[in-house]
Amino acid sequence: MEKVLRKVFHESERIEVESDLLGAARAVCQHQEGLACILGTGSNSCLYDGEKIIGNVPPLGYILGDEGSGAVLGKLFLNALFKGTLPDGMKEDFLQSSDLSYPEIIQRVYRQPMANRFLASTSLYISEHLDVPALRDLVKENFRDFFHKNIAQYVRHDLPVGAIGSIAYHYRDLLQEVAEEEGYKLSTVAKSPMEGLVAYHAY
């Protein structure tokens, strides 16, 4: 990757190729210690010392882990939808608005590629119906699991938490609520790391 980039940016003195997690950490924590999170289709987190990652709880992917992610939120939503624990009429409304049937959803999840992206796509419907308490509770449950199973493992309540990604960004108010309830300070939330990375490298 570095060789490819150097062909394009041949006048650059220095080219770094690092992980998306380090990019997220630098974007939200800059040169300070902190807990950095990615909350998008998948999820990840790390303990960051202001320069490098010094701790990482493995996210395990959407089947075994990825708490806080869009894929897991989709799993929670579809489970509640078809098991009848959401308000009356919501299942019919979702199926109509998504132009999907129950068999088609099962097909997309179990027999087609990129099931995680399909599951995460249900977030659009959820975000448009956040006036429904049951859906707000699902979003908060997803974030709470993320804090309990990932962030809490770093045992650093003293550090600020920063988050990158579409799920963090679109549900930032609920993420803020959960962070405070769990005893953390949410410092920065951004949809993309780009602006933060520009600031990091300009310093």
PLM regions and their residue ranges:
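Phosphate-binding/catalytic loop of phosphoryl-transfer enzymes
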Residues: 1-89
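ATP-binding/phosphotransfer module of carbohydrate and carboxylate kinases, centering on a glycine-rich
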Residues: 3-9, 28-35, 76-203
